[in-house]
Amino acid sequence: MSKAHVVGLGKSGVAAARLLKREGWEVVLSDSNTSDTLLKQQQELAKEQITVELGYSLDFAGALPDLIIVSPGVPWDIPDLVKARDLGIETIGEMELAWRHLKSLPWVGITGTNGKTTTTALIAAIFQAAGFDAPACGNIGYAACEVALAEIPPDWIIGEMSSYQIESSVTLAPHISIWTTFTPDHLARHKTLENYYDIKAKLLRQSHLQVFNGDDAYLSKIGASHWPDAYWTSVQGKESLLGEKGFYIEDGWVVEQLPNSPPQRIVEASALRMVGAHNLQNLLMAVAAARLADISPNAIDKAVREFPGVAHRLEHICTWEGIDFINDSKATNYDAAEVGLASVKSPVVLIAGGEAKPGDDTAWLAKIQAQTSAVLLIGSAAPAFAQRLKEVGYTHYEIVETMEKAVRRSLELAKHHQAPVVLLSPACASFDQYPNFEARGDHFRELCLELVGEKETNSNHH
């Protein structure tokens, strides 16, 4: 019996283990951590004859596995995995395993630094409105292997793919691939910008059709020469379209331009309820995917009008006395946080901080100076951010450390400055105080609703 070893006990790892088990593999699933939750999962999986090793790393002394599957959150270049590859053990990502089971079906692959999640969710919504069974998977929705485990295979697979997932996928070749934006984000893992670009480019090279965001400075600069057959998008109209074919916005409409045919209006840009120019870029890419899959403008229009947006991405939580509380916890880098500030009404009371990431904060700091009346700093980045704000001559900041304090103080400051918006847009990872950005956003949501509930109760008593 062939032996497989799955690294990482998240939902992706568990789904991969179940898929391999079903195929007749002997499966060990390991995680370097241990906790009550993991111990409970260990007992559950034992009933399915899947061995779970906790607080464990790969052991090269005993019998070696024939195949190693790596969960999306596990760095591709940790010593264990480098050693496994040097020993000639086939080592692939969970997404690649799913692809091997589902490669007879058409995939849409979405990658990029920012904008992936919204674009993926919108594409899935459009395909579903057109009557397709088209689950979103990968970084959002299901783990890719959960889709592979389904009794009845879907019509399309809409996969959000991080650079880690692409790096660990050897043969993954979607029918349509989309590259949303390219900014130096995950450099800790990928060492250099070129390396990070090459990884993402691999996905598009292996795809049948490519769609690029032509409004992204980096992609448009290198794009036309590298990708002569691609479809480009631009929110700035036909003049800004790279190449002969693509999708652009003109007179408030998304317009399709294909070779040898007149431009065709597909959907009104105002049909999308989400705020911000960057969401029009996401809309264009989603429409491009839908049209390349021959989906009718009617289905596109219906899906776009009904699309609610994405949690943790400029998510409107509540309004109290004219002050909007907005959760943008997904803004884990300077670029995304700058977009967040640009997309809401100003002046803003901004909550920022967490675990800082490398990057250029210049544009973000300028946006803070232009748009905010106060900044509340949380998490381990707070002292460094305070220092940076001081250096650019911005003094309306306070270090509050925790989300609880930040939310309470934000309401006081918003009232004082008559600011219409309290915005959580951290520009940081969340790992100093939370398991992930979702947990951070959920906590913010909870605190806002609690605070507003309290205020309403109090005002009813007077």
From Swiss-Prot:
Its EC number is 6.3.2.9. Its main location: cytoplasm. Pfam families: Mur_ligase_C, Mur_ligase_M, MurD-like_N. GO terms for biological process: cell division; cell wall organization; peptidoglycan biosynthetic process; regulation of cell shape. It comes from the Bacteria. ATP binds at residues 112-118. It catalyses: UDP-N-acetyl-alpha-D-muramoyl-L-alanine + D-glutamate + ATP = UDP-N-acetyl-alpha-D-muramoyl-L-alanyl-D-glutamate + ADP + phosphate + H(+). Signal peptide: none annotated. Disulfide bonds: none annotated. This is UDP-N-acetylmuramoylalanine--D-glutamate ligase. The lineage of its organism: Bacteria, Bacillati, Cyanobacteriota, Cyanophyceae, Nostocales. The gene is murD.
